[in-house]
Amino acid sequence: MEKKGFTLVELLAAIVILSIITLMGSVGISAAKKGINESLWNNNINLIEAAGESFGTDKKEYIKNLDPSEYSCEIDGQTISPCLTVTVQTLLNRNYLSSKERIEYDDTTDYRVIVNKTIDKAKVIVPADEEANFESGYYVNRVKVYIYVENDIVYAKYSGIIAEK
């Protein structure tokens, strides 16, 4: 008597093997997606800082003449003065930075945003007034950008969260 087909054990083994392969693939895809998001966000930081430098170049004399006792910032543990502090939103409003991503704000305004999708809301403390910043990622429009002049060269430093590791 010839048997045609597979036994139940063979079918279950095939299903288990396919499940393992699928699981391994989805874990790999998830890790790749996280790496891509981190890379994209770090590129966004470079764009924000470049926009800050352009803004600072246009305001170089103004920045150099700021009162150092009133206009200072701390960058990497070092106090720098004079230093002009602006927000990412200022750079967006003055067209030094652009964004295609938009949200509805105050129920009427079409609001341009820069979104950091590497931030896990569960891993950070969110102040009550920032809750709206976590609709689909973290909106960084309120984050400060420090702009200063050193040796007649304009520098800008993004002060927000870089990327989660």
Which role fits each region the language model picked out?
Residues 2-29:
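N-terminal single-pass transmembrane signal-anchor helix
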Residues 3, 43, 47, 86:
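Short, well-structured alpha-helical interface segments that form or flank functional binding sites
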Residues 10, 37, 79-81:
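Charged, low-complexity surface patches
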Residues 19, 25-50:
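Aliphatic-rich helix starts adjacent to a transmembrane/signal segment
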Residues 44-63:
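N-terminal alpha-helical signal peptides/signal-anchor transmembrane segments
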Residues 63-134:
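Extracellular/periplasmic head regions of type IV pilus-like filament subunits
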Residues 112-165:
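Short, surface-exposed interaction loops/tails
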